[in-house]
A protein has these predicted regions:
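Bacterial Sec-dependent N-terminal signal peptides
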Residues: 1-12
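Acidic/histidine-rich, surface-exposed loop or edge segments in extracytoplasmic proteins
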Residues: 24-39, 359-373
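Short N-terminal segments immediately surrounding and downstream of signal-peptide cleavage
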Residues: 11-34, 390-395
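Surface-exposed amphipathic alpha-helical segments
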Residues: 11, 365-399
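Compositionally biased, low-hydrophobicity segments enriched in charged and small polar residues
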Residues: 9, 355, 362-363
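Short, solvent-exposed recognition patches
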Residues: 36-354
Length: 399
């Protein structure tokens, strides 16, 4: 049972079972200020966002249901994200369903909730197999069109989905995507599960396939940025150890020779690594350049599909440990068939064209519920059946 706060509804009860059929109460967003990164947006941007959120809330009230709960609404802002080169703000309308509980014969409202309904404008999608910078993203950032908010090179904007059905569901908006159970600890018998629906303006797709040509060109861009970063780091380490050697050279005591030799050998290792990075850069670049030059345009325009080994491996997306040891991150051999691999996706440029930062480009509707808890699952079933998808789509089509 969730812990209760001090606010009580002026009714009495005997047990929690008495409360499940009490009509749900809805509290609009005015009970709490909009949370999150409101300061990241201008007054004009906030006005547009709040207008959209208020419209969503007005519509939601018409079909609100939450027997046995107090549904409290709130508005929230996130920092936002880049969709290709376009920055869009992310903001949301959330209703948390606070369970009514019986405590000392009085009906009270729990101060925590495990079930919520959420509509997010311009959500960022986490597909689970995203290409990433392996902790060196700072080497691969590029200026963005949002002040103090950098973007990344093309390679790290691409998306790969562990569930091959997800891109179609995201683009179609016809069915939900349900997450795997999310356990909070080893004793959690009622894990969180989330259902997500995605919506775009009529006739628009959110995701499109990356072509082989685009993917190969993005690898070349990565190589050109990776090389100077690696060489700079080796030069830094070599310079540090050379400075240390100079200190030992001033010492006349033979006891220092062992330490001197240690740093001397380490410099040689760094110099060897430096040359290896130079060679790896040339090997990787030559391979990709050859594929771009030797294949017909029709081949290059096919979707980029990467092997399971490349995707599931932990060697900076290289196909094998041996390959990784020889030439490093994002060593590339060839594409594979759709049956044997994973398609690479990107944000649809036709959807993410220049527009105001808080303009609604697409929307995600989420239902988070507690598996195995009857009250939570009733809320899940009600909103799954009664969501006003027509209204949600109208927000996008009015732009």
């Amino acid at each position: 049972m969730l812990a209760a706060n001090q606010s009580a509804i002026s009714q009495t009860c005997i047990s929690d079972d008495d409360l499940t059929k009490l009509p749900g109460k809805f509290t609009d967003h005015k009970w709490t200020p909009a949370g999150g990164h409101t300061s990241s947006y201008s007054a004009v941007e906030q006005t547009l966002a709040l207008k959209n959120l208020s419209s969503i809330e007005t519509n939601f009230v018409k079909y609100f249901w939450g027997d046995g709960t107090n549904g409290k609404a709130s508005f929230g802002f996130s920092e936002g994200n880049y969709f290709n080169n376009l920055f869009l703000g992310q903001y949301s309308f959330t209703v948390g369903f606070y369970e009514l509980i019986c405590k000392d014969g009085n009906i009270k409202t729990a101060h925590e909730f495990g079930t919520d309904f959420k509509i997010t404008i311009n959500p960022f999608i986490e597909p689970g197999l995203n290409i990433n910078g392996r902790g060196r993203q700072y080497d691969f950032s590029v200026p963005g069109n949002r002040k103090n908010f950098s973007n990344t090179i093309n390679l790290f904007r691409y998306m790969i989905f562990s569930n091959k059905e997800e891109p179609e569901k995201i683009n179609s908006g016809n069915s939900y995507i349900e997450s795997k159970p999310i356990y909070h600890d080893a004793y959690d018998k009622h894990p969180d599960v989330v259902r997500n629906w995605y919506f775009a303006p009529a006739g628009k797709m959110i995701l499109i396939e990356v072509t082989r040509k685009e993917y190969l060109e993005s690898l070349l861009e990565f190589y050109e940025r990776e090389k100077p970063g690696l060489l700079k780091e080796m030069d830094r380490l070599i310079a540090i150890d050379k400075s240390t050697l100079k200190l030992y050279e001033k010492e006349k005591d033979g006891k220092s020779k062992k330490d001197y030799d240690y740093f001397l050998n380490r410099i040689k290792e760094y110099e060897t690594d430096r040359q290896r990075y130079e060679n790896a850069y040339k090997t990787k670049k030559d391979k990709v350049t050859s594929l771009l030059k030797s294949n017909a345009e029709s081949w290059l325009n096919e979707p980029a599909v990467l092997s399971k080994e490349v995707i599931m491996g932990s060697y900076c997306r290289s196909g094998s440990l041996k390959e990784y040891e020889e030439t490093g991150c994002f060593s590339f051999n060839d594409f594979v068939s759709i049956e044997n691999g994973y398609t690479v996706y990107k944000w649809n440029p036709d959807l993410f064209k220049q527009q105001p930062a808080t303009s609604p480009a697409f929307i995600k509707v989420s239902l988070r519920y507690k598996s195995g808890i009857e009250l939570s699952e009733k809320i899940r079933d009600y909103y799954t059946k009664n969501l006003d998808f027509t209204f949600i789509k109208s927000i996008l089509n009015k732009k």
